[in-house]
Amino acid sequence: RYLEICIVNDKPIGFLYGKIDRYGDKGYIRPGYAYIMEFYVKTEYRRKGFATQMFGRLQSLFKKDGAKIMYLTADPITGRPFWERMGFIETDQVNPDNQMIIFEKEID
C-alpha cells in the first residue's frame, strides 16, 4: 500500500492512496493490477502541476513493485478530464462498489 502526502510550504495540499491487488481481492480486476483508491489536491493548488507530479511518483512506485496496469474510478466532472490527460482509457467495466466506470492505463 502507498500513502503519500504532498506538502508545500510546510502545509499538506494533497494526498494519494493506492495499492497493488496481488490476489484479485476486488474480484473484478485481475491480480497484479495497481489500484488508485484515493487521490486529492486542494482546489487552490490544482492546475499547478502538483497532481501530475504526485501521479508520476505513484506510477513509479507501482512500476518498481511490478505492476503493469493501473486502474481507478473517477468523478466525471473533477476527475475524469485529469485522468484522461494522464493516459487513462475508459473500459466497459463498472466498479460494483461505487457504480462508476473503471479506467485503465498501462504503466509507463
Label each region the model flagged:
Residues 5, 11-20, 35, 40:
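Conserved beta-strand in the GNAT
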Residues 7-9, 105-107:
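Active-site beta-strand termini and strand-to-loop segments that position acidic
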Residues 15, 91-93:
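Residue-level detector of high-confidence beta-strand sites
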Residues 21-36, 46, 97:
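A conserved beta-turn-beta hairpin within the catalytic core of GNAT-like acetyltransferases
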Residues 41, 47-60, 85:
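Conserved acetyl-CoA-binding loop-helix of GNAT-fold acetyltransferases
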Residues 68, 89:
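Short acidic/polar active-site loop segments enriched in Thr and Asp
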Residues 71-84, 96-99:
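Conserved beta-strand-loop-alpha-helix junction that forms the acyl-donor binding cleft
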